[in-house]
Each structure stands twice: as C-alpha cells, then as structure tokens.
Amino acid sequence: METAAKTNKRDIQDGPPKEVKLPISEALLDYHCQIKENALEQFMARIKKLREKNQKYHERNKRLKDEQIWHIRNLLKELSEEKSEGSVVVTREEVENAMKEKWKFERDQEQNLKDMRIQISNAEKLFLEKLSEKEYWEEYKNVGSEQHGKLITSLQNDINRVKENAEKMSEQYKITLEDARKRIIRETLLQLDQKKEWATENALRFIDKGSYREIWENDWLKKEIANHRKEVEELENAIHELEEENLVLIDQLFNCRLVDLKIPRRLYLTQAVGQEVPPEVPLELSETHKVIPEKSDSQPVDIKSRDVSSISFGSSGFRLSHKDSRFGQLLKIDEEASSSIEFGASDMKYLLYEDEQDFKDYVNLGPLEVKLMTVESKKMPIHFQEKETPVKFYEDVRSPESHITYKMMKSFL
C-alpha cells in the first residue's frame, strides 16, 4: 500500500512537462529528497524482512518451548517413577538444605566472578599504565635520550674541567705553601744565627782576659790537632808505600843471582874501590854485639862493607825522596833503634845499586883466597830539623786573626 502511494506521488510529481526547468536550489532539494526517499524505502524493506524473521523465530521458540516442557514432564515422570521404586524419601528440611547449599554455591560463584572481574579490571588498568609507561619511554628513547645524553656529556666535561682546575690550584697552593715554609725556616734560621752572633758579641764584651785567651788557645789547639791528624795520615800513607817498596826489593834480592858475594874483600878494596889493604883483624861476633848496644839514640852506625860512599849516597837519596822533614827524622830514629836491620838494608841497597863497570878486571885476576867480611861501627852525630812553633803572647790577641767568632764559641757548647 505504501509503495503504491509513493509510486502515485512520483507519477504526480513527474506529471509536469519536462520542458519546465527548475532553479538549481530546488533541483538540489529534489535530488536530496529522492536520495532520502530511496534510503527510506530500503530501510522499510529491511525492517519488513526483519519483522518476518522475528515472527518466524518467535514461532520456532514457542514450538521448542512446548517440546522442552513436554520432555521435562516426561523426564520428571520417569524420575518420579524411579524414585518411587527404589529411592529414599527426601524430607523438606533436606530439600531446603540442598537449596541453601546450592544458593550459597551460586553466591560464591557470583562473588568469584565479581572478584575475577575486579582482578581483570585491575590488570587492564595496570596494563594500560604499563602501556602508557612503555610509550613514554619509547618516546624518551627516540627524542629525550639524545638531549639528556648531550646534557650528561656536557656536565661530565664540566666536572672534569672543575677537577683539573682544582688539582692545579691545589698543586699551586702546595708549591706556594712549601716555598713559604722554606722561606720562613730560612729567615728564622738566619735570625737565630744573627741573634746568636749578637748574643756572643754581647757576651764577649763581658768576658775577662783569661777566659778570652783560653778560648783563643782552644781554637788554636783544634787547628793544630787537625794539621797533626793530616800529617799523621800522610805519614801512614808514606810508610805503607815504603813497606810495599821494601817487600818488592826483598823479593828482587832473593830472586836475583848475587855473583859478587864470591869476590874476596882484598880484591874488592884494591881493584874496585882503590883503597889500601887494611891489616887483617879477626872477626869476633862478641865485639860486634858489644858495639851495637853501646850506641846511643843520637849516634847512628856507619857500615863499611863494600862501598861506604855508595851506601851513604843510596841512603841519603832514599831519605831525600820524602818531602816531609819530620818523616826523615823518624827514619833516622828508626835507624838508630835497629842498627842490625839498617846494616842489612844498606847492604841490600848496595847490592841492588852496584855498578858492574867496576868489575872489568875481575875476569883476569885468577883464583884468589876467599876472605870473610868485617863490620865496623863509627859514632856520628844526628842533626834534627827543628820546627819553629809560633809563640804568641797575650798582646797578639788583639790582632784580627785572633778574634773570637760565633763558630769558635759554638764549638765549646
């Protein structure tokens, strides 16, 4: 019916001749109206179909309900018959208890469902929070991390720069502190020395003449002790060298062949030295032993064994080789104390420093009688080299060299 009415309306609207042209606004309105009418017709047709389907579904549901009721009744009848045959009769209290338990179970199930829904909602909220946090951190990773990284690097550079500056400043402060400490110590020491000198100068004004002379003599004695120690050290070194030379000479004496020992005394005196033949005197060891202890400290022994001049020349040259005169005096005293040792040393020197040219005629002499040698002693004076010691009186104290200084006073403390 409605469709027929709509078709009639369309026919009526389409009635005017086509030659009449409507304005653009009316044409647009007609076009929109036609679109709305077409959509309305489609919706009406769809609603009609849905109503028919709904009616069919209602009928089917009604039929299924009737069948369900019939089946339930049959089942109930069968159950009642089975229960009546061999089941226990259930009382009302049992039914009520069973219903209460069932209701309680259902309420528990409903509560569990509510709890599960609450947990699900909480989990969804937490998931949404984590998701939003994840999105935030992803955005931070993509955008903010670079900015923060640049900021962190700049801050680290600033921190390192500040540390370097602090270390440099601390080193500079340490250097300045050390310099100031050294300067203060140096100035304090200088001031202490200056004050001590002033104190000594002030003290020297009140020193009596006796104490002044004692101080000066003590300083002079210290200088003399230092010089004496130096001389003793030089003498020890010289003695050590002489001992080494003596050992070398003894070694040479024992290793060389002394052929001239076989030459008789008469031949040596007549041919080598050119002296007259002395009268023969028997060699007595007792006399020689008597002569040696009779010599005093001031009388050396002169030994005439082969060449007195060569022996004296060798011994004098040996003594003159030393620079120190005191050392020569000590050698003279040693010669006086041990004449027998001096005899052996002089003879050794003669044998070492002999001249072989004096024995040219030794080959043409022929066999001669071997004579024993004799030892003669002669008293000779000893001349000591006196060292003049400077004698200073009390009047010399006023000289500038004898001025008492702070170092001299400090040595007494």
From Swiss-Prot:
Alphabetized UniProt keyword annotations: Coiled coil
Keyword Phosphoprotein assigned: no
Coiled-coil regions listed: 32-186, 215-255
Cited InterPro entries: CCDC83 (IPR026702)
The protein's name: Coiled-coil domain-containing protein 83
Native organism: Bos taurus
Gene: CCDC83
